[in-house]
């Protein structure tokens, strides 16, 4: 039976003891001091007090982080079928390039002429993504998918602003099966969000969409395949409706892995698309980073020869044919501007560069196809099993992911989707995304990438079936899960409440000092 390590591990700051050191650098040789004189540090560079860093030995640091790793779980431990996250294997061949010491020592302010290799790699990723998505221009500037979304929304805003109709174009339409950050990005951009429902067939309800589209429509944001794992069959008709109304069509690339090499957003007539390098292109992610959300566009004319390409955030890497050099081009007059410091999350871009080179066009297409096969094999394993159902067009094949519902299980036993997730954890299996999308009650959003074996998928399905049977035999059992993990079931309210949530050591210090005021 699986058991996860349970170390009574303190924070590394709590391990600190005054005077303890990991290494003691030698004092400078007296002959050297005599030759060069004493070190004279400008007062403006001197600290007023020592840095607040833990004082620990090297062996304590190594043991501390080793023990923490034993209480964690990631794709190197086993499958992580988090729906809409595409947690695929991170090839070590890509890591060899991304962590090359010659790249780690570069500085973003170096002259372009001295970093031509890195700039070429960034430029090539832009070009490859442009072809993969079927678009005309691309930037790798955004640091995350959500930042790529915001860039797209700001471009839609600038588009209508330059055309002089922003005052009436105040609505962005978002299907209820879209990626979760779409409505947030639209709202951050200053737009009103109008939601359109999903029909029983898993497609956007076209009658509802026709009623929503009008003279106030600035654009539509959609994920295809949707968060249900279904390909939007009416995408060309949706595109026609939005464009005829004067709006722009935005593609959320969160689920690109399900169609890569088979279909392209540009061919679906999208105007703007973002891609997640940390999903489709194998860059490691989780815990907040590193992410990369490149944005690609069609050269749709805005006004007087200005196109959507001119609106892209930056800086961007371009190739100067006259000089035969790659250059960093700062944001131009019409650009929505900088979204972050420097060019991009360069490490993530270089990782994707190595992955795309290693896979090639055929390999990328095969990866998408295998992810689809894995998902549908899992569906077949779960088909008709008591406790779970497949909402929305159960006879339609899914793409990269599937959303099961534990509603029948809850109705009969009281066990919820959260209980199912805890039961998976208790068996050493990573839990899926739960309670999303919101249109599925007791949702279990499961995505097996191309990395997973037939045996891993079968083991996951078998455990889901065991959970249902255990809940039927004794409805109180699921509430006791997990028992074999490092941490037992947490109090979600306390863990997330503004009065108690403590995401960083800095917040912990402020709490101990009583400097965090009451919730207002």
Curated annotation (Swiss-Prot):
A single BP term in Gene Ontology: glycine decarboxylation via glycine cleavage system
Necessary cofactors: pyridoxal 5'-phosphate
Residue ranges of the region described as Disordered: 1-29
GO CC annotation terms, alphabetical: cytosol; glycine cleavage complex
SUPFAM superfamilies, per database record: PLP-dependent transferases
Keywords, alphabetical: Oxidoreductase, Pyridoxal phosphate
Keyword Oxidoreductase annotated: yes
Gene3D superfamilies tied to this protein: 6.20.440.10, Aspartate Aminotransferase, domain 1 (3.90.1150.10), Type I PLP-dependent aspartate aminotransferase-like (Major domain) (3.40.640.10)
E.C. code: 1.4.4.2
Enzyme kind, highest EC tier: oxidoreductase
Pfam families tied to this protein: GcvP2_C
Modified residues (N6-(pyridoxal phosphate)lysine): 279
Catalysis: reaction(s): N(6)-[(R)-lipoyl]-L-lysyl-[glycine-cleavage complex H protein] + glycine + H(+) = N(6)-[(R)-S(8)-aminomethyldihydrolipoyl]-L-lysyl-[glycine-cleavage complex H protein] + CO2
GO molecular function: glycine binding; glycine dehydrogenase (decarboxylating) activity; pyridoxal phosphate binding
Similarity-based family: Belongs to the GcvP family. C-terminal subunit subfamily.
Functional summary from the UniProt entry: The glycine cleavage system catalyzes the degradation of glycine. The P protein binds the alpha-amino group of glycine through its pyridoxal phosphate cofactor; CO(2) is released and the remaining methylamine moiety is then transferred to the lipoamide cofactor of the H protein.
Oligomer status and interactors: The glycine cleavage system is composed of four proteins: P, T, L and H. In this organism, the P 'protein' is a heterodimer of two subunits.
Name listed for the protein in its UniProt record: Probable glycine dehydrogenase (decarboxylating) subunit 2
Protein's organism: Aeropyrum pernix (strain ATCC 700893 / DSM 11879 / JCM 9820 / NBRC 100138 / K1)
Gene: gcvPB
């Amino acid at each position: 039976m699986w058991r996860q390590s349970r170390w009574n591990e303190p924070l590394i700051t709590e391990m600190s003891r005054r005077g303890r050191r990991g290494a003691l650098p030698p004092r400078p040789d007296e002959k050297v001091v005599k030759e060069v004189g004493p070190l004279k540090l400008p007062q403006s560079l001197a600290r007023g007090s020592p840095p607040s860093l833990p004082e620990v030995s090297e062996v304590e640091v190594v043991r501390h982080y080793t023990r923490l790793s034993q209480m964690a779980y990631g794709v190197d431990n086993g499958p992580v079928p988090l729906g809409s996250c595409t947690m695929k294997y991170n090839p070590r061949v890509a890591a060899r390039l991304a962590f090359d010491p010659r790249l780690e020592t570069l500085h973003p302010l170096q002259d372009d002429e001295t970093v031509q290799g890195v700039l070429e790699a960034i430029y090539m990723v832009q070009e490859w993504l442009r072809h993969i998505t079927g678009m005309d221009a691309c930037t790798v500037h955004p640091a995350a998918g959500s930042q790529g979304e915001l860039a797209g929304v700001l471009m839609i805003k600038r588009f209508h602003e330059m055309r002089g109709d922003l005052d009436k174009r105040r609505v962005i339409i978002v299907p209820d099966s879209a990626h979760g950050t779409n409505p947030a990005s639209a709202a951050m951009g200053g737009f009103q969000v109008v939601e359109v429902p999903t029909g029983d067939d898993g497609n956007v309800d076209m009658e509802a969409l026709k009623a929503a589209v009008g003279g106030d429509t600035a654009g539509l944001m959609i994920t295809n395949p949707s968060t249900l794992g279904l390909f939007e069959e009416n995408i060309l008709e949706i595109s026609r409706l939005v464009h005829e109304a004067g709006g722009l069509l935005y593609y959320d690339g969160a689920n690109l892995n399900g169609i890569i090499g088979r279909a392209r957003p540009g061919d679906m007539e999208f105007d703007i698309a973002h891609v997640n390098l940390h999903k489709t292109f194998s860059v490691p992610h989780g815990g907040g980073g590193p992410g990369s959300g490149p944005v690609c566009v069609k050269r749709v004319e805005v006004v007087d020869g200005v196109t959507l390409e001119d609106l892209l955030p930056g800086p961007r890497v371009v190739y100067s044919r006259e000089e035969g050099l790659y250059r960093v081009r700062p944001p131009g007059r019409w650009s929505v501007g900088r979204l972050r410091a420097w060019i991009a999350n360069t490490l993530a871009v270089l990782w994707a560069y190595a992955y795309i080179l290693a896979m090639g066009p055929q390999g990328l297409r095969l990866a998408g196809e295998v992810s689809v096969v894995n998902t549908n094999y899992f569906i077949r394993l779960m088909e008709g099993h008591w406790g779970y159902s497949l909402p929305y067009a159960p006879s339609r094949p899914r793409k990269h992911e599937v959303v099961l519902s534990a509603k029948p299980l809850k109705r009969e036993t009281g066990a919820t989707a959260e209980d199912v997730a805890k039961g998976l954890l208790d068996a050493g299996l990573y839990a899926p995304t739960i309670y999303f999308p919101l249109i599925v009650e007791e949702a279990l959003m499961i995505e097996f990438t191309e990395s997973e074996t037939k045996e891993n998928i079968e083991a996951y399905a078998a455990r889901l079936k065991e959970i249902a049977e255990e809940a039927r035999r004794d409805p109180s059992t699921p509430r006791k899960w997990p028992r074999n993990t490092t941490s037992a079931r947490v109090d979600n309210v306390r863990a997330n409440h503004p009065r108690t949530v403590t995401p960083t050591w800095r917040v912990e210090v402020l709490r101990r000092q009583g400097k965090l005021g009451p919730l207002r």
